[in-house]
Amino acid sequence: MHQSLIVARMAPGAAPDIAKIFEESDRGELPHLIGVSRRSLFQFDDVYLHLVESERDPTPAITKLAGHPEFRGISERLSAYVTAYDPATWRSPKDAMANRFYQWERDNRS
């Protein structure tokens, strides 16, 4: 399972609006086209955390579908609520991705 964690800033009180945008989008074809199998949204003060889970790295599909009407639409709708974590250093979506520096999994051997 591949996981990507997107980090950004979010407007105060915007969590319900952001959730609604994704709820509507997740009923469409976009998650299937990108390969998303699970999405979780988190908030810590004004920090927006978006965990995307998929069978493989979705970056190539996201790059390919960046011009797709649904992708552009969700990006435009989110722009009212979500901004770059550090606008001075943001150049592309990869600049919003957190870097995993540790992972542990329980050994399932009994």
Indicate where each model-derived feature is located:
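Short, charged/polar surface micro-motifs in flexible loops or helix N-caps
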Residues: 12, 47-48, 54-60
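Short, surface-exposed charged micro-motifs
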Residues: 40, 51
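Short, low-order "capping/linker" segments at domain edges
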Residues: 85-110
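An amphipathic, aromatic/His-enriched active-site/gating alpha helix that lines ligand/cofactor pockets
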Residues: 29-36, 55-92
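Short amphipathic alpha-helical segments
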Residues: 10-37
